[in-house]
Amino acid sequence: MTISQPGTISATLGEMTVQLRLSLAALMQIEDALGASGLEALAARFRALTASDLSAVLTALLRAGGHEDADALAQAAAPAEAAQAVLACFEANLK
């Protein structure tokens, strides 16, 4: 996984290379989806992430990365690939 522009990484989901972007809008969507307010609350929620939470986070990052089919891509992703992609995006952007 590589960073191609600020906030964006490339990741592989299945046979497809996708762009995930951690933007302010994506963070807002993630906070809303997880019912968390702020990065500290998000970190706490991430420690007990459900499959629905993971899908919501991946969808927000894919949408911010420019994928119009973000919902379908997130739902089709293998759980391990989805988790790795989300982790890589946050690690690349929140150092």
Can you name each region flagged by the protein language model?
Residues 1-17, 28, 32-52, 62-95:
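Charged interaction scaffolds used for protein-protein
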Residues 23:
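Residue-level signal for threonine
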Residues 58:
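A residue-level signal for conserved active-site and pocket-lining positions in enzyme catalytic cores
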